[in-house]
Structure formats: C-alpha cells, structure tokens
C-alpha cells in the first residue's frame, strides 16, 4: 500500500509523522511534493494529489476520507478509528468535514503547484 501525502504541508506532515512511528512494513510513504512519479502511479494531477490524501492499494486509488479509513484499518493502534468512522452516518459526516478541512489546506498550500 502506498500513501501519497504532502510533506510540505506542516499539518499534513505532523499527522503522517505520527502514523509513520507505527513502522507498518506494508505501508510505503510517498511525498507528493514535485513528484512526477506519484502523478503517474495514481493517474492524478499535482492539483488532485495536493487536494486530498491518496492511497494506492492493489492497483486501486482511494482518496480523502475513504483513504483515511483504509490507512486506519491497516494500523492496529488506529483500528478503533476505522471501526468508528466506517459507520455510514459517521462516515458521511466525516467525509463532509474532511472535504472542508482539505479545501482550506489546499488553498493554503496551492502555491506548491507547478502551474
């Protein structure tokens, strides 16, 4: 499983650094900052990658709240988050809140785009 994240975003980096401490061997952490290969692997533009967290697992790309669910499911310490946020009503609310938060992070970080 590959997790595509923005290492240049302080908030994103802080959260991912917490997850990296779990040292899950099956997770490959990929910084999307100026990373053409990340764009090719995910078939996403730099803008799309900057906008949301992405995960590629078994050749399928997940993004946003769905990507977080997959990440938490693979991390024993955070599986309780998966079990809670996968509930349909909770997931719908989480997705909306995630999109709002991700939008503001995107606005803050879009200067990183190549144009």
What are these regions (language model features)?
Residues 38-115:
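Thiol/selenol-based redox catalytic cores and closely related redox-interacting motifs
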Residues 27-38:
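Thiol-based oxidoreductase modules, predominantly thioredoxin-like and allied folds used
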Residues 1-25, 97:
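Local sequence-structure signature of Cys/Sec-based thiol-disulfide redox active-site neighborhoods
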């Amino acid at each position: 499983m590959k997790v595509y994240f923005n290492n240049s975003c302080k908030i994103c980096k802080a959260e991912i650094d917490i997850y990296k401490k779990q040292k899950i061997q099956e997770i490959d952490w990929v910084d999307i900052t100026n990373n053409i290969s990340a764009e090719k692997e995910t078939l996403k533009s730099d803008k799309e990658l900057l906008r949301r967290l992405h995960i590629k697992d078994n050749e399928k790309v997940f993004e946003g709240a769905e990507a977080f669910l997959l990440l938490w499911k693979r991390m024993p310490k955070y599986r309780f988050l998966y079990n809670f946020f996968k509930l349909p009503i909770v997931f719908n609310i989480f997705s909306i809140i995630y999109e709002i938060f991700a939008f503001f992070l995107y606005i803050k970080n879009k200067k990183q785009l190549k144009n």
